[in-house]
Amino acid sequence: MKYVNVIACTLLAGGLLVTAGCATTSSKVNLVVDKNQEARLVSTLDYLPAPKTDETGAFLPYEASPNPYLAQRGKIKQESIVKYIDAKRALKQKNYRHAEQLFKTLTEEDKNLSGPWIGLGDVAVEQKQYEQAIAHYVKAIELNSKNVNAYMRLAKTQRLQGNFLHAQNTYAKALALWPDFPEAHLNLAVLYDIYLNHPLRAQKHMEAYQFLTNGENKEVAKWLAEIQQRTGVPISLVVEKQKAQSKPLS
């Protein structure tokens, strides 16, 4: 399959932040997680970056919205941080039983932390226990509706189950929370292109990823060019627009 390295990296991108996960007062998030529940394609066009121009027509530098999860502040006990790091290390070493024990202990010692629930979900995914993983990720979102990592993990797991529209709905929730989430745009583009056969939607969100990351990923640039050849639609979010380049006045 084309660009397999990009797919492998991007579908994991939402979970690479090493954080124990703060707690917040969260409202109920309406997630479509039951695989037997019908899911319909929802529009995600409203979450695309919209560069602005000044009175001369010059593009202004784009100011991306901040990650709402990282903007949260909270105190986490030092011993919890150490235990969380140990759990992540055990997971990386495929010591799933030990990792699960540590994450479970963290959920019992501090019932407000969302991060350990993501960890439990990751353990379940590694063992292909997808339903259990989904339950853990949903719990993380219930505890902290701004934990963007949980949405990414949930969508990835739904994709692994073959529930592609459910995954699309979850990525839409992530972008509603943080419209300038680069990895959510890229993962959604992959989903649109490879699994849902919506190349134009894929192009728009892959453009968004390139725009928000200054076009640093050359593999994605090649993929985007290939999609654009298929759609025949010109690229609308040119990376150079972020540098306030002038456009001709009509």
Q: Locations of the language-model features?
A:
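Short coil turns that delineate tetratricopeptide repeat
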Residues: 111, 145, 179, 214-215
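Residue-level recognition of tetratricopeptide repeat
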Residues: 88, 122, 156, 190-191, ...
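Terminal, low-structured helical/coil segments at or just beyond the last alpha-helical repeat
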Residues: 194-250
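TPR alpha-solenoid repeat register
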Residues: 116, 150, 184, 219-220
